Amino acid sequence: MTSRRSQEKSYAEAAAAPPPKEAASSDVTPAVPADVIYKLLGFTAAMVVGPIGMYFITVNSGASSTVAGITAAITANLVLFGYIYVAWLDDREEREAASKKKEKKAQ
């Protein structure tokens, strides 16, 4: 007959086991602020609608398709540079706020 092992943990097993995890805090704030998402969606729409719209406006005004393509490419680049500029301004504002916070903490 085989012997049964008790269901309780031995002292060595209990000491080696990791401590029970505490409940995680219920922080439900989004990782990315909503205004950043709205800006991204706006520039995405501008990147889709702007160049295509400029292409068809240019073609319908009597210009060649080559000129219309160049106009669409320029429009896409303007939207891209606009997004980069807005992102740079947001980042600069965040860095200034963080430096002010550090200054205030140091005092």
Swiss-Prot record:
It comes from the Eukaryota. Belongs to the VMA21 family. Signal peptide: none annotated. Keywords: Cytoplasmic vesicle, Endoplasmic reticulum, Membrane, Transmembrane, Transmembrane helix. It holds the Pfam family VMA21. The lineage of its organism: Eukaryota, Fungi, Dikarya, Ascomycota, Pezizomycotina. GO terms for cellular component: endoplasmic reticulum membrane; endoplasmic reticulum-Golgi intermediate compartment membrane; ER to Golgi transport vesicle membrane. It is a multi-pass membrane protein. GO terms for biological process: vacuolar proton-transporting V-type ATPase complex assembly. InterPro entries: Vma21. Residues 61-68 are lumenal. Residues 1-28 are annotated as: Disordered. Its main location: endoplasmic reticulum. Residues 1-39, 90-107 are cytoplasmic. The chain crosses the membrane at residues 40-60, 69-89. Residues 1-11 have a biased composition (Basic and acidic residues). Disulfide bonds: none annotated. Required for the assembly of the V0 complex of the vacuolar ATPase (V-ATPase) in the endoplasmic reticulum. This is Vacuolar ATPase assembly integral membrane protein vma21. Residues 12-26 have a biased composition (Low complexity). It is found in: Endoplasmic reticulum membrane; Endoplasmic reticulum-Golgi intermediate compartment membrane; Cytoplasmic vesicle, COPII-coated vesicle membrane. The gene is vma21. A motif (Prevents secretion from ER) lies at residues 104-107.
